[in-house]
């Protein structure tokens, strides 16, 4: 305790008693830290029949199509398969003799692994998609879903967002 020169009232010194505040470790905000890494992928030469079986067996609605260097070249979904089935019936064509490249969607919205979950949230809001392939230097490294972003927000709830 110190005494003020003009008063007899003790003053507590905060200079010496001040504790060093250790900054809290900031939780990561990057897409790469919340994405799903182990994906079921397809190649452009796989048959539509094989894709349908894989989708059903794994209870998924679609997956990325990659080349031999793990570069994303498209996505194939249940909707692509159904469109193909519908067109095959209309043109009276067999539908199991075609490959993924005949039915996949080649123009794909993606997000980079080093973007923030807020960038992902904005992208989800603008496009109304449920998931995005995640790329790192042009290679597919994972997928982020709306649910992944919501989970990240819950984990980060006590942190200020900048």
Predicted regions and their residues:
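Tandem CBS (Cystathionine beta-synthase) repeat/Bateman regulatory domains
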Residues: 1-162
